[in-house]
């Protein structure tokens, strides 16, 4: 499985990409979508919602299970991916392109607490055992 090097990751399988405009784009990882299977529903947080790192903020539902998505960093939701309401399967097609929501980070230092691609790879290897 390919793990993009330009993203940060959480132990609960969310990814974060810091954009040029200072916002952070968030989604679930390829590993998470493989575990869940075919997506049938996605609930994203409301624009304007204030999130703290670790807050439950979205839900992804598949034919197998529903899973909470946690805010990887603290900030204000600035956008939610409108395509996922009618086409949740986009997450299965490309988990790193089918973002869930965007935040304006309250503190970019939160990103330093997240895993890089090598750290995330080690996490996946430890979960396989």
From Swiss-Prot:
Do the record's keywords include rRNA-binding? Answer: no
UniProt-listed InterPro entries: 2-oxoA_DH_lipoyl-BS, Biotin_lipoyl, GCV_H, GCV_H/Fam206, GCV_H_sub, Single_hybrid_motif
Example GO biological process term?
glycine decarboxylation via glycine cleavage system
- Subunit field text: The glycine cleavage system is composed of four proteins: P, T, L and H.
Which coenzyme or cofactor does it need?
Answer: (R)-lipoate
Per UniProt, the keywords (alphabetical) are: Lipoyl
What Pfam family does this protein match (any one)?
A: GCV_H
Query: What function does the entry list?
Result: The glycine cleavage system catalyzes the degradation of glycine. The H protein shuttles the methylamine group of glycine from the P protein to the T protein.
Question: NCBIfam families annotated for this entry?
Answer: gcvH, PRK01202.1
Q: Which family does it belong to?
A: Belongs to the GcvH family.
Keyword Nuclease in the entry? The reply is no
Provide the species name.
Nitrosospira multiformis (strain ATCC 25196 / NCIMB 11849 / C 71)
CDD domains xrefs: GCS_H (cd06848)
Spell out which residues are annotated as carrying N6-lipoyllysine: 64
Protein name according to UniProt:
Glycine cleavage system H protein
> Which HAMAP family does the protein's record reference?
GcvH
Give residue ranges for domain Lipoyl-binding: 23-104
Q: How is the cofactor bound?
A: Binds 1 lipoyl cofactor covalently.
Q: Name one GO cellular component term.
A: cytosol
């Amino acid at each position: 499985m390919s793990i993009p090097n330009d993203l940060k990751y959480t132990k609960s399988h969310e990814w974060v990409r810091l954009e040029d405009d200072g916002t952070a784009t968030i989604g679930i990882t390829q590993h998470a979508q493989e575990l869940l299977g075919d997506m049938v529903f996605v609930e994203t947080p409301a624009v304007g919602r204030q999130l703290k790192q670790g807050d439950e903020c979205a839900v992804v539902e598949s034919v197998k299970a529903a899973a909470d998505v946690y805010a990887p960093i603290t900030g204000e939701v600035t956008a939610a991916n409108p395509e996922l309401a009618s086409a949740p399967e986009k997450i299965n097609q490309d988990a790193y392109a089918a973002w869930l929501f965007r935040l304006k980070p309250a503190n970019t230092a939160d990103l330093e607490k997240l895993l890089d691609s090598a750290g995330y790879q080690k996490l996946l290897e430890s979960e396989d055992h």
